[in-house]
């Protein structure tokens, strides 16, 4: 894989409000032990009524700029991964452009659900490597609490809100991206969806309350079958072994799912970074949250080789091997 871009900054944000397992016990028939055993989750963050995906994204970008002393004036592309945009249109990316007054930039949202962040990184790297862009801001932001059915205990225990942002800049000497592997299984879309205009999918009637609908059993089977194969293919493309990977950062869908993927891929769970325990499933945001948490804990070092793997609704997945050189 050819690359001319490097990750030069990262920022994250989560709302203040905490939704604990004990809180959920008061809302649906569940308990802390049941949730932890099945998901590994203890808490998740919830946006206020006045907070939307654009607000969370802006705060994550501000965190990036403050932490790494970055200026956004010369950003020439904004990519936002989200399934919970404030509006059908305009895009969250356009709202970000307006807020930061970035003068000359491409701006668009992409919807790849839980794989959205790795999709965004892959597209951003491709734009820079093709020499059409120089500086790309990749953002993941979700307010899943606004589209979660809090009467459905199979889904309401899972989802939380948050945002993450990464800056990509041209650097031909120390590029970040080593390899990519991706795939789509659109026939599984019925297993994880949220309706908009259509009330059927491939002739099958849909639940039309505009909340997240998930067949957890089928999604689990797909992910634990597909992601290990994807990891194997990803490593094979660059003649690498599992031992060459310093850290595995999968989408934090569910800790039990991650444990199964690790077991099938022969990746030690100790080499895995997640955000699942105290942030829940934040869809496209789980990977940047896990990365920034690892930075704060002093786990990531320059030169580390990371394997990022996003997967989810679509059904779709995209994995990346990245050299971490956040100087």
From Swiss-Prot:
One GO CC term, this protein: cytoplasm
Q: Which reaction does it catalyse?
A: malonyl-[ACP] + acetyl-CoA + H(+) = 3-oxobutanoyl-[ACP] + CO2 + CoA
Any keyword Chloroplast?
no
Kindly list the GO molecular function terms attached to this UniProt entry: 3-oxoacyl-[acyl-carrier-protein] synthase activity; beta-ketoacyl-acyl-carrier-protein synthase III activity
* Region span, ACP-binding: 252-256
What superkingdom heads the lineage? Bacteria
Report the locations given in the UniProt record: Cytoplasm
Q: In which pathway does it act?
A: Lipid metabolism; fatty acid biosynthesis
Biological processes annotated in GO: fatty acid biosynthetic process; secondary metabolite biosynthetic process
Task: Name any one Pfam family assigned in the record.
Answer: ACP_syn_III_C
Active-site residues from the entry: 114, 251, 281
Q: Which InterPro entries does the entry mention?
A: ACP_syn_III_C, ACP_syn_III_N, FabH, Thiolase-like
List UniProt keywords, sorted A-Z.
Acyltransferase, Cytoplasm, Fatty acid biosynthesis, Fatty acid metabolism, Lipid biosynthesis, Lipid metabolism, Multifunctional enzyme, Transferase
Which Enzyme Commission number(s) are listed? Answer: 2.3.1.180
Quaternary assembly? Homodimer.
Write out the function statement from the record. Catalyzes the condensation reaction of fatty acid synthesis by the addition to an acyl acceptor of two carbons from malonyl-ACP. Catalyzes the first condensation reaction which initiates fatty acid synthesis and may therefore play a role in governing the total rate of fatty acid production. Possesses both acetoacetyl-ACP synthase and acetyl transacylase activities. Its substrate specificity determines the biosynthesis of branched-chain and/or straight-chain of fatty acids.
Cite the domain annotation text: The last Arg residue of the ACP-binding site is essential for the weak association between ACP/AcpP and FabH.
* Family according to the record: Belongs to the thiolase-like superfamily. FabH family.
Report what the protein is called. Answer: Beta-ketoacyl-[acyl-carrier-protein] synthase III 2
Which species expresses this protein natively?
Answer: Bacillus cereus (strain ATCC 14579 / DSM 31 / CCUG 7414 / JCM 2152 / NBRC 15305 / NCIMB 9373 / NCTC 2599 / NRRL B-3711)
């Amino acid at each position: 894989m050819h690359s001319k871009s490097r990750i030069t900054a990262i920022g994250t944000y989560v709302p203040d409000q905490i939704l604990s397992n004990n809180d959920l016990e008061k809302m649906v028939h569940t308990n802390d032990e049941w949730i932890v055993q099945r998901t590994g989750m203890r808490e998740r963050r919830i946006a206020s009524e006045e907070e939307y995906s654009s607000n969370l994204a802006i705060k994550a970008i501000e965190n990036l700029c403050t932490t790494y002393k970055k200026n956004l004036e010369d950003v020439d592309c904004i990519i936002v991964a989200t399934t919970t945009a404030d509006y059908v249109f305009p895009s969250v990316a356009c709202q970000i452009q307006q807020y930061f007054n970035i003068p000359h930039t491409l701006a668009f949202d992409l919807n790849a659900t839980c794989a959205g962040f790795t999709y965004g990184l892959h597209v951003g790297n491709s734009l820079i490597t093709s020499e059409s862009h120089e500086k790309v801001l990749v953002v993941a932001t979700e307010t899943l609490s606004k589209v979660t059915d809090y009467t459905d205990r199979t889904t309401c225990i899972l989802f939380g809100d948050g945002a993450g942002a990464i800056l990509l800049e041209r650097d031909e000497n120390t590029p970040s991206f080593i390899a990519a592997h991706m795939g789509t299984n659109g026939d599984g879309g019925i297993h994880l969806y949220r309706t908009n205009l259509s009330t059927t999918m491939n002739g099958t009637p849909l639940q039309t309350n505009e909340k997240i609908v998930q067949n957890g059993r089928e999604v689990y089977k797909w992910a634990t079958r597909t992601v290990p194969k994807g990891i194997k293919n990803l490593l094979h493309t660059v003649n690498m072994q599992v031992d060459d990977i310093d850290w595995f950062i999968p989408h934090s869908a569910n800790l039990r799912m991650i444990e199964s993927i690790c077991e099938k891929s022969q990746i030690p769970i100790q080499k895995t970074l997640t955000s699942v325990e105290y942030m829940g499933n934040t869809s496209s945001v789980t990977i940047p949250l896990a990365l920034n948490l690892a930075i704060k804990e002093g786990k990531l070092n320059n030169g580390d080789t990371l394997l990022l793997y996003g997967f989810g609704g679509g059904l779709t997945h995209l994995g990346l091997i990245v050299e971490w050189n956040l100087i």
